Amino acid sequence: MNTYDLVIDGGGPAGLAAAASAKDHGIDSILIIERDKELGGILNQCIHNGFGLHTFKEELTGPEYASRFIDMVLDRGIEYKLNTMVMDISADKKVTAMNREDGMFEVQAKAVILAMGCRERSRGALNIPGYRPAGIYSAGTAQRLVNMEGYMPGKEVVILGSGDIGLIMARRMTLEGAKVKVVAELMPYSGGLKRNIVQCLNDFDIPLKLSHTVVDIEGKNRVEAVTIAEVGSDRKPIPGTEERYTCDTLLLSCGLIPENELSKSAGVALNPVTSGPVVNDSLETNIDGIFACGNVLHVHDLVDYVSQEASAAGKNAANYIKNGKEKDAKIVEILPVDGVRYTVPKYIRPTEMDDTLTVRFRVGAVYKNCAIATYFDDQLISKRKRPVMAPGEMEQVILDKKKLGEYPDLSKITIKIEEA
């Protein structure tokens, strides 16, 4: 059995950034395992621009952004395996994988970084009524067909869900000559970034219908029409509000789910809100030496944030490999309440964390003219006003190690939404 200091499951933006960071922090024995035929992950099919503004201070396409991190990995001589599927990860950091060249094989790692990304919610998970004809795709599948395979999924399109991929595909299909009839969103707010709503829908006069969902799909061999209806506060269709659209394609952009089947096999505890691992300030899970970063941890808005998080995971994994398990330190829980759905990380160690720590979270509804309040126990520490907050846009709070040191008896940190 081969042994490595660090094994990274996933060769997308998170895995690449984590590998480069670990190498820069003194770890030479690294293996990246990627199930696709090339490194780069989902970025290879994201040919639109908007990437890299935070990381490189310039606007790049997805493949351009990926290529920069691929070059970092190649320049550092980091080993990787393509077309290789990880089958199991054990709590003692034994990774079982398989490919055509090696068959099924095992590698033993001193530390493992989970960077598997996320998957789209399928039609089966949505329980959409109607027939099951050809022409129903997830937005990501349609994106791959158009941008990488050179196939056009359809000519008249209805999109269910206003996640970022759905919004971007509304624009992409329009640019390729299709007619996007409508984008329907179950919730009373969009699930995507405000800039994508403006650039992908408003600029192309594509209607967005909030609080609407698909109630029927017509067609036996191919989609012929889709009926949408308004939903009430209980998210159930309101009779008499149905609208029928003739179309040959239905795209689904109804949320992303972190790919954590392997995490479960290792015994990693998952957050029921994010469906991703519960981590501390070093992005370490409840299993010693297993770290998580990127969309497998929680779904991000920007790949730049994924790279920042993954670089931190790589550095922290390197420290673990060189120094062993960190000494037992006081653990403080971060509590998300009053409009805050979750926080990443969930736990911090005030004496062991970096000088500053970014805590990222999402709100549960649209808030206007409110503030993000941070409490140490019951004492208000900071209150930052925000004109608008929405579930589609990630928020953050910066914790200062020096400030935390002033509260040696701290038992909890609370982050909540309050009136400004």
Residue locations for each model-derived region?
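Short, aromatic- and glycine-rich surface loops/edge beta-strands on solvent-exposed regions
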Residues: 372, 402-420
